[in-house]
Amino acid sequence: MKNINEWHHIFKLDPAKEISDEHLDQICESGTDAIIVGGTDNVTLDGVLDLLSRIRRSHMVPVVLEVSEEETLTPGFDYYFVPMVLNSKEKKYMMDIQHKAIKEFIDMMEFAEVYFEGYCILNEDAKAFQYTNCVMPDLDDVKAYAYMAEKVFHLPFFYIEYSGAYGDPTLVKEVKEELQNTQLLYGGGIETTAQAKEMKEYADTIIVGNSIYTNINEALKTVEAVKGN
């Protein structure tokens, strides 16, 4: 299994969305470095467990649970990513939910498997932006959040999340220039190989999600586009 800092491509699956066994097998065998299980709406423990069991049935790809609600925490994942939404106006989305989850489930998870992410959501129309009550940052704000993620909180990841919309490559480039050790993740609106390549020029890791459900063939091509498999 690769170290996380060697991951270049991740698929993100929403346990509240339908995916056929055929498409799930294609995702798992695509050569992606990992699969994140996570979403915003209607995410339940049953949905998380069902998706995990379907992946584990015949695949060895690393699987990550993105912890947004403590009710969906369950053993069996290789890693747990805990988002801290830095541009939320509510402390609970940066600290309180995370604290509650760790307090309740710390004995269940090996701490080496738990990684905190500095999250910055940049799409005002996204459900995640509205759900976490975010404020829309400008470029200088985002660069400052990146600085905080690395220099203040010493987080392993800074995640630029456009959540369904394709983002600004120039912003991603400038944020990357602020980071030396923290790994830059980009997610949002990647639907083509050209977009995957463009964002991968600047981000350490790209995350492909929505296009799995809208155009599976193009989504699968993004793996080779950034990894050259």
Curated annotation (Swiss-Prot):
InterPro entries to which the protein is assigned, alphabetical: GGGP/HepGP_synthase_I, GGGP/HepGP_synthase_sf, GGGP_HepGP_synthase
Cofactor: Mg(2+)
Residue numbers binding Mg(2+): D14, T40
Keywords: Lipid biosynthesis, Lipid metabolism, Magnesium, Metal-binding, Phospholipid biosynthesis, Phospholipid metabolism, Transferase
Signal peptide: none
Pathway(s) it belongs to: Membrane lipid metabolism; glycerophospholipid metabolism
Binding site for sn-glycerol 1-phosphate: K12, Y159, I160, E161, Y162, S163, G164, G189, G209, N210
BP GO terms, sorted: glycerophospholipid biosynthetic process
Catalytic activity as recorded in UniProt: sn-glycerol 1-phosphate + all-trans-heptaprenyl diphosphate = 3-heptaprenyl-sn-glycero-1-phosphate + diphosphate
EC number(s) recorded for this UniProt protein: 2.5.1.n9
Single GO MF annotation: heptaprenylglyceryl phosphate synthase activity
Record flagged with keyword Translocase: no
UniProt enzyme class: transferase
One Pfam family here: PcrB
HAMAP family, per the entry: GGGP_HepGP_synthase
Family: Belongs to the GGGP/HepGP synthase family. Group I subfamily.
Function: Prenyltransferase that catalyzes in vivo the transfer of the heptaprenyl moiety of heptaprenyl pyrophosphate (HepPP; 35 carbon atoms) to the C3 hydroxyl of sn-glycerol-1-phosphate (G1P), producing heptaprenylglyceryl phosphate (HepGP). This reaction is an ether-bond-formation step in the biosynthesis of archaea-type G1P-based membrane lipids found in Bacillales.
NCBIfam families, per the entry: GGGP-family, PRK04169.1-1, PRK04169.1-3
This protein's name: Heptaprenylglyceryl phosphate synthase
Organism: Oceanobacillus iheyensis (strain DSM 14371 / CIP 107618 / JCM 11309 / KCTC 3954 / HTE831)
Highest classification ranks of the organism: Bacteria, Bacillati, Bacillota, Bacilli, Bacillales
UniProt gene name: pcrB
